[in-house]
Amino acid sequence: MAKDVQVMLRQAVPGLGKPGEVVSVRPGYARNYLFPRQMAVRLTPGLLKEQQMRREQEAARKLAEKQQAENYKKALETIGRFVIRKKVGEKDLLFGQVTASDIAEVVLATSGLDIDRRNVLLDEEIKKTGVYLVQVKLHPEVTATLRIQVTPE
């Protein structure tokens, strides 16, 4: 019986794996199906080293991104309050409401940090003046809590 060969997948193969994974397959399957369709390459020591190096670089990049997000979190939380001025009617009710875009704009104006409005997590609608706590997702593992003060214009 033929011995299985080790290949690295270049693209997703149903039932086999994702790109970059090392899998064992029968030689005929590799030679007749995977190699001609450029779906996989034969695993060599050089390719293995290259893949290991890529993984290390990716891990270092992710760690640097998380560290940067932690630094942004500290900077945002030391600012204290972000003030948003809105037109107010009776009983301190706003005309409209404070949106995630408003919060992203005031953070940019105050701290210089450009955050995406989709990363601003509003637990409740802000329709009155006052102080509110708002979560901002800076990284999948890092969330900052901002104090937003809504005041009349």
UniProtKB/Swiss-Prot annotation:
Protein name per its UniProtKB record: Large ribosomal subunit protein bL9
Domain of life: Bacteria
A biological process term (GO) from this entry: translation
InterPro entries per UniProt: Ribosomal_bL9, Ribosomal_bL9/RNase_H1_N, Ribosomal_bL9_bac/chp, Ribosomal_bL9_C, Ribosomal_bL9_C_sf, Ribosomal_bL9_N, Ribosomal_bL9_N_sf
Cited function: Binds to the 23S rRNA.
Keywords, comma-separated and alphabetical: Ribonucleoprotein, Ribosomal protein, RNA-binding, rRNA-binding
Cellular component annotations (GO), alphabetically ordered: ribonucleoprotein complex; ribosome
Family: Belongs to the bacterial ribosomal protein bL9 family.
GO molecular function, one term: rRNA binding
Pfam families, A to Z: Ribosomal_L9_C, Ribosomal_L9_N
Matches recorded under PROSITE patterns: RIBOSOMAL_L9
HAMAP family reported in the protein's UniProt record: Ribosomal_bL9
